[in-house]
């Protein structure tokens, strides 16, 4: 498992933009809710720790992970958040259902990112066992929800700066690099 030697909840707040002015959409699967609610807690804790306001966080529930795609699409269209976080958990069983759902959700979220101006963050646990999911949703490996929240803040900031055209702030435009709170992000020409 890739996270065996990494705590997903660790981040350096000094490297993350302030989230106060961003609107966050969260679409969460009700399936495996004992896992997804843990991921949601990690998302909320990290967002608020980085300045997000509760009034700027919208939550929608969907029945399962496959429905995350439609939920995120509709949230983007109707709520106009700066970023959407999709939260789900698929645990491998005895049939091919696991592979089909994981592939479909992965491709669907990828498609939203390609076709929409709003970033969609992929917080879908795809584990072989329930214990692996527990370990990654607030257990021994930290919380993948925390990692997703930090990615969401960074992507909302990137979107904001890209929409400004990178030239609006002299502080941001430095030798073809965008500064994210002191971290360089190289711009490809």
UniProtKB/Swiss-Prot annotation:
The active site is at 97 (proton donor). (2S)-2-hydroxy-3-oxobutyl phosphate binds at residues 94-95, 136. 5-amino-6-(D-ribitylamino)uracil binds at residues 31, 65-67, 89-91, 122. The keyword Nuclease does not apply. It catalyses: (2S)-2-hydroxy-3-oxobutyl phosphate + 5-amino-6-(D-ribitylamino)uracil = 6,7-dimethyl-8-(1-D-ribityl)lumazine + phosphate + 2 H2O + H(+). Transmembrane segments: none annotated. Keywords: Riboflavin biosynthesis, Transferase. GO terms for molecular function: 6,7-dimethyl-8-ribityllumazine synthase activity. Its EC number is 2.5.1.78. It is an enzyme of class 2 (transferase). The keyword Amino-acid biosynthesis does not apply. One of its GO terms (biological process) is riboflavin biosynthetic process. Signal peptide: none annotated. Pathway: Cofactor biosynthesis; riboflavin biosynthesis; riboflavin from 2-hydroxy-3-oxobutyl phosphate and 5-amino-6-(D-ribitylamino)uracil: step 1/2. One of its GO terms (cellular component) is riboflavin synthase complex. Belongs to the DMRL synthase family. Catalyzes the formation of 6,7-dimethyl-8-ribityllumazine by condensation of 5-amino-6-(D-ribitylamino)uracil with 3,4-dihydroxy-2-butanone 4-phosphate. This is the penultimate step in the biosynthesis of riboflavin. This is 6,7-dimethyl-8-ribityllumazine synthase. It comes from Flavobacterium psychrophilum (strain ATCC 49511 / DSM 21280 / CIP 103535 / JIP02/86).
């Amino acid at each position: 498992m890739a996270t065996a030697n990494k705590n997903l909840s660790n981040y350096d707040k000094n490297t993350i933009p302030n989230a106060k002015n961003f609107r966050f959409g969260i679409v969460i699967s009700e399936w495996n809710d004992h896992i997804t609610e843990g991921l949601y807690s990690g998302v909320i804790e990290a967002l608020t720790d980085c300045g997000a306001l509760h009034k700027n966080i919208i939550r929608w529930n969907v029945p399962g992970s496959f429905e995350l795609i439609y939920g995120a699409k509709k949230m983007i269209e109707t709520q106009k958040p700066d970023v959407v976080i999709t939260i789900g958990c698929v645990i491998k069983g005895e049939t091919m259902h696991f592979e089909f759902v994981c592939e479909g959700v992965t491709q669907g979220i990828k498609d939203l990112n390609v076709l929409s101006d709003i970033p969609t963050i992929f917080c879908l646990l795809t584990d072989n066992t329930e214990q692996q999911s527990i370990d990654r949703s607030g257990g021994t490996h930290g919380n993948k929800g925390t990692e997703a929240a930090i990615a969401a803040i960074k992507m909302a900031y990137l979107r904001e700066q890209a929409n400004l055209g990178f030239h609006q702030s002299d502080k941001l435009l430095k030798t073809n690099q965008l500064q994210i709170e002191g971290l360089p992000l190289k711009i490809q020409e």
